[in-house]
């Protein structure tokens, strides 16, 4: 049996182990397409700001092709470094594309104000064609979908600080799109707006340079459909993280946005570890969880073997991502979701609509949290040096806290209900007026006589015998009553019974000194 268990553990490790790079064959390369990336050819701030302005307009042009749009985005993403060309060449290793760098300098002879650097060759016309300044219709389209503030005509500046603020504002909006461009593009707008508000409050971005929704949709769609662009963005994030010492302000902002990008699409795996294993509830000892716990252990080892690209496996379309889906450990995932819903309010909006979701183990997780509330782990208490008296105090406080939390979360919801009091007079009852009022009083008096003589079991028959059959009860229901006499009869019967009961309560209340008054507290008790 021991040999079988060792073989099983070895099998599980090798099953999820990534293939080892070996063999005589070379790297497999696909059919590449060329991407032209414009970069500044000098260190002038005017050149960079003008290039940024032209690229933003170019991306807003709906007629731009996909590879050209990718090149423009890569050019903007690399503008914050001192040498964009060196950065692109260093971090780019894509088997699907071939990047061509074009240095851009200022020019007074072109409509775009820029030209491609060359030795003795006039490239103004080619630059105008690239930046869509060759015809007025395309120029007008390039302005569509730009900034929300229409008073901003251009973003050309000569001040390095102002350029960094404008560039950082645009880059923040682009990088935030990567967080949900692949995993949840339909619900991305709300989270992107929250990130924008956060960075606006922190003065990291300038609110006036908020880009229009259509421009952001174009960029988000391109990020979602172009793997090469996502590879470049992930490689740039990893390169920034590996940089020692202090980083530029824009680089630090990119690292901050990375906290929303990292582990995108891996929520099931991460939350199962957080709520299913790290909470260390005794339910982990169930035999049903034994196999899935072994699977999770193998996946955690595989995650570590993948290295620094593991948190980005979904954005990088790594085929190994399917092993980390919740379908590989459905029972443990369902249990962890139940634990998470009870522990964190933010888990309440999570979508559990999966075919492998097991409600029984979900409820198991909920019950484990509820019944374990206030208990102190003996192992953890011994490690922290907590005495038995302190543990009892913590348990008592935690129990009261949990009860308060439950009462606030699922407390009784009281409706707007009015109660009939024993001391309420006839004048305070709803009046119908005229003949109807007299008929109701007469019927109610006869109902009291019938109640005294025959008891409550036969009082309803006496009330039904004196029911006015042809009189509508309310002006709002008059048309309905005239169309259906039976409905009118039933409505009148119900109202008369209610008023008769009110009269009986009045008589019973007159025999006692203190009338019974009903309120919400009596009902809850």
UniProtKB/Swiss-Prot annotation:
Motif (Nuclear export signal): 425-440
Superkingdom of origin: Viruses
Phosphothreonine found at: 279
Residues that hold RNA according to the record: 180, 195, 202, 260, 351
Residue ranges of the region described as Interaction with the phosphoprotein: 477-505
GO CC annotations, alphabetized: helical viral capsid; host cell cytoplasm; host cell nucleus; ribonucleoprotein complex; viral nucleocapsid
Main location: virion
Pfam family, one: Paramyxo_ncap
UniProt key word Nucleotidyltransferase: no
Region called Ncore, residue ranges: 1-403
Composition bias type Basic and acidic residues, residue spans: 433-452
Keyword annotations: Capsid protein, Helical capsid protein, Host cytoplasm, Host nucleus, Host-virus interaction, Phosphoprotein, Ribonucleoprotein, RNA-binding, Viral nucleoprotein, Virion
Region of interest: Homomultimerization: 1-36, 373-391
Region spans: RNA packaging and organization of the helical nucleocapsid: 1-375
Post-translational note: Phosphorylation at Thr-279 is required for the formation of the nucleocapsid.
Positions occupied by motif Nuclear localization signal: 70-77
Region (Ntail): 404-525
Disordered, as annotated region: 418-525
Localization terms from the record: Virion; Host cytoplasm; Host nucleus
Domain remark from Swiss-Prot or TrEMBL: Ncore is globular and carries regions required for N self-assembly and RNA-binding. Ntail is an intrinsically disordered monomeric domain in the C-terminus.
Family statement: Belongs to the paramyxoviruses nucleocapsid family.
Record's protein name: Nucleoprotein
